[in-house]
């Protein structure tokens, strides 16, 4: 297959899921995207061809896996324009963020400030709340101002006491993105010793990120939201910071010696952050995934298609007088909304009855837990205009008919 103009129907042929579930429309991609056939085949291939542990360096098969893990680390590094030594494999983006927050603990002093938004995924809120409590740091909450950009609001709260700025690059609830590079530049001017942590979980599948062009210290994402396997997260940690950071998990082969006074000497990075047997199968599958995109599909064209899909989804949703969008500044195709007359659970149930998968609730955003619920539609590159039109048709159903279907 050669690279051509992106065609979603051609792309769908790379997923057996659509053959096995022809009646379903997947609009819950921000939770987990469908895995490429390349990925599922790689998982099977790993167990059939290898199924060995990289910590044994004698057998040839083990050494092949060691080489594949190193190669995958380099492929990820190339994708983000960083060095392989700055890429760490974890179990999830959640673990990655916890790893970095835990590692910063000795650097945070009472009175230091941690700047973050409260209406983001709890994975990029709870670790910082815990860090503040453990270190007696002060949490500074960012509230979007009507007459100010989100970037300027962040910058207005940064001062010499700021030690960490935790940024979610794209909201999993609202689909709007933030220029984290601009905030990082400003923070480093105000306090060069401060840290910028970026949650890019909802960004990497929609935008190309060149970390080398930024001053961020950390970035996290999960492969299962980018057509990849579950159980694998990736953390970028700036190489110059790694020697000072303590690992989150201890064990395995991450150390060189233990002194008589119980001081642990860790191996060189990134191995000291990867205690225990890694998810080798998922790393092997990630290798195949990145090679697939490099060889068979043009990611720039995919991003352009995603932008077009976002525009069409917005127009269809915004034109329905019964639908109230949570915001109107989406940068990626993620939309949260309410129905003027229906509870979100009823609307989501109606869509499920008609074979459309969506998410409903507070969607892992603690601020809205037990307070404010939404229906979320999140798209990927295999979604089509035809699917969006089907959604629009269902949302145009009169309220009485929807309720009648739900209570059957």
UniProtKB/Swiss-Prot annotation:
Catalysed reaction equations from the record: (sulfur carrier)-H + L-cysteine = (sulfur carrier)-SH + L-alanine
Family recorded in the similarity comment: Belongs to the class-V pyridoxal-phosphate-dependent aminotransferase family. Csd subfamily.
Principal EC category: transferase
Superkingdom of the organism of origin: Bacteria
The name this protein goes by in its record: Probable cysteine desulfurase
Keyword Thylakoid set for record: no
GO molecular function ontology, one term from the record: cysteine desulfurase activity
Residue numbers bearing the N6-(pyridoxal phosphate)lysine modification: 225
TM stretches of this protein: none
Assigned keywords, A-Z: Pyridoxal phosphate, Transferase
Function summary: Catalyzes the removal of elemental sulfur and selenium atoms from L-cysteine, L-cystine, L-selenocysteine, and L-selenocystine to produce L-alanine.
Cofactor: pyridoxal 5'-phosphate
EC number, UniProt record: 2.8.1.7
This protein's record includes keyword Ribonucleoprotein: no
């Amino acid at each position: 297959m050669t690279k051509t103009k992106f065609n979603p129907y051609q792309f769908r042929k790379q997923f057996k899921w659509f053959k096995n579930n022809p009646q379903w429309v997947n609009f819950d991609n921000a939770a987990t995207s469908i895995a490429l056939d390349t990925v599922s085949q790689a998982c099977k291939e790993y167990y059939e061809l290898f199924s060995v542990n990289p910590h044994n360096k004698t057998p040839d098969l083990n050494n092949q896996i060691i080489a594949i893990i190193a190669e995958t680390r380099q492929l990820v590094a190339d994708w983000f324009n960083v060095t392989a030594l700055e890429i760490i494999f974890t179990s999830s983006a959640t673990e990655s963020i916890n790893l970095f927050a835990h590692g910063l603990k000795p650097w945070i002093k009472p009175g230091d400030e941690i700047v973050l938004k409260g209406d983001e995924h709890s994975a990029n809120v709870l670790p910082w709340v815990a860090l503040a409590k453990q270190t007696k740091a002060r949490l500074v909450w960012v509230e979007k101002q009507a007459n100010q950009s989100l970037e300027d609001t962040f910058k207005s709260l940064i001062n010499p006491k700021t030690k960490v700025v935790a940024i979610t690059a794209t909201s999993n609830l609202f689909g709007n993105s933030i220029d984290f590079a601009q905030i990082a530049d400003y923070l480093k001017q105000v306090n060069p010793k401060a840290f910028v942590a970026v949650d890019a979980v909802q960004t990497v599948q929609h935008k190309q990120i060149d970390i080398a062009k930024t001053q961020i210290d950390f970035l996290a994402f999960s492969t299962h939201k980018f057509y990849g396997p579950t159980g694998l997260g990736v953390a970028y940690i700036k190489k110059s910071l790694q020697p000072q950071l303590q690992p989150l998990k201890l064990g395995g082969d991450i150390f060189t010696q233990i002194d008589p006074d119980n001081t642990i000497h860790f191996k060189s990075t990134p191995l000291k952050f990867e205690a225990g047997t890694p998810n080798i199968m998922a790393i092997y599958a990630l290798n195949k995934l990145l090679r697939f995109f490099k060889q068979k599909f043009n990611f720039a064209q995919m991003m352009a298609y995603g932008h077009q899909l976002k525009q069409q989804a917005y127009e269809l949703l915004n034109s329905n007088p019964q639908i109230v969008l949570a915001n109107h500044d989406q940068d990626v195709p993620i939309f949260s909304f309410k129905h003027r007359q229906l509870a979100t659970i009823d609307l989501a149930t109606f869509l499920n009855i008609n074979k459309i998968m969506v998410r409903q609730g507070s969607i892992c955003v603690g601020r809205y837990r037990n307070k404010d619920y939404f229906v979320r539609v999140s798209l990927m590159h295999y979604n089509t205009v035809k699917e969006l039109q089907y959604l629009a048709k269902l949302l145009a159903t009169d309220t009485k008919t929807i309720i009648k279907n739900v209570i059957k």
